[in-house]
Amino acid sequence: MTQDELKRLVGQAAADYVIQNVPEGAVIGVGTGSTANCFIDALAVVKARYRGAVSSSVATTERLKSHGIKVFDLNEVDSLQVYVDGADEIDASGAMIKGGGGALTREKIVASVADTFVCIADASKRVPVLGAFPLPIEVVPMARTAIGRRVTALGGVPVLRVTKDGAPYITDNGNEIIDVKGLQIADPRGFEAQVNAWPGVVTVGLFAERGANLCLLGTENGVETIVYSAN
């Protein structure tokens, strides 16, 4: 199967999980990116079962609305039973690197209030150690260079994310993103806490403190379900 076929496979598997485990009338937390889009497309078929969704980005909001799925602001919702999102990398503990699509801060906020985080990914995203995929850090623009120096001191190579025109990429929150190459993150929780403590960091794209509870992993043999009992 191609990577796109695997994404559609796990998107459907996540919709099936929601149907089986989330009661009718609930609001669903939805992530951002190409794999999350496959989940949205599958969820649209059964949208009448649910009140709507909480979105993690402008792009996701647009896709949800295009399917006629009502979008709630997180402030309008008391709780979320489930949050479904992709990952750029996921390790054996359920810790992830996320933010390749630029929505890491809102993804982390929505994930933090959900009872269950369901990660959907193809098998190429499963890694023994996080860090081969560049680690995104959303930063307040004036702190970009100072944070870059801190990253360099830890052995990382900071690269400012830019658009096709060469201008700094701007997040939905009005900030910039530094992508850090060359890391091997042996202690994701510790590294997440360390980077988040730097002045000017909005959030780092490590999801270890709030890792996945469940991963639906697309493989050549079908969907593999992995449960992370420690999260």
Curated annotation (Swiss-Prot):
This is Ribose-5-phosphate isomerase A. Belongs to the ribose 5-phosphate isomerase family. Pathway: Carbohydrate degradation; pentose phosphate pathway; D-ribose 5-phosphate from D-ribulose 5-phosphate (non-oxidative stage): step 1/1. Homodimer. InterPro entries: NagB/RpiA_transferase-like, Ribose5P_isomerase_typA_subgr, Ribose5P_isomerase_type_A. The keyword Isomerase applies. Its EC number is 5.3.1.6. The active site is at residue 107. Keywords: Isomerase. Catalyzes the reversible conversion of ribose-5-phosphate to ribulose 5-phosphate.
